[in-house]
From Swiss-Prot:
Origin organism lineage: Bacteria, Bacillati, Bacillota, Bacilli, Bacillales
Membrane topology: Peripheral membrane protein
Cystine crosslinks: none
GO cellular component annotations of the record: plasma membrane; proton-transporting ATP synthase complex
Alphabetical keyword list: ATP synthesis, Cell membrane, CF(1), Hydrogen ion transport, Ion transport, Membrane, Transport
Name used for this protein in its record: ATP synthase subunit delta
Amino acid sequence: MNQEVIAKRYASALFQIALEQQQLDRIEEDVRAVRQALAENGEFLSLLSNPNLSLEKKKALVREVFAGVSAPVKNTLLLLLERHRFGLVPELADQFIALANDARGIAEAIAYSARPLTDEELQALSDVFAKKVGKATLHIENIVEPELIGGVKLRIGNRIYDGSVSGQLERIQRQLIG
């Protein structure tokens, strides 16, 4: 079975628990923290996949490292560890965040721009493009790419809206050539 499908099942179960316990915000915050901790400490994942370390020691490590996270998140991590699927945690986190955002009417987006965008500019992008994708609002991450020259390229899911100067120049070039 595809790893993404498996991760989505665990994420869905955790999401249901979050809704039942009315702790969606807290659990999402914990899931984001776990994802970031694992991204910054790749050797921790390697340590947990070491066959020389007993399951009990691995569980103790997870309990110690993630002592501050909520019980549902910690229990999910321990369950994944028992089932030798701890490597799914980053994908599970992405899937959980997507479910939480969908429930709130929020979409994740990345805005590529030649310079850092102000909060007002990010809000204006959110206001305009949220309606286009049928969401209440967008959570936009700004990535600076000077090669865009000017304008903005916005990625929402698998859609790309290219309003950059370099994108316009490429379109003009394609029209002239072919």
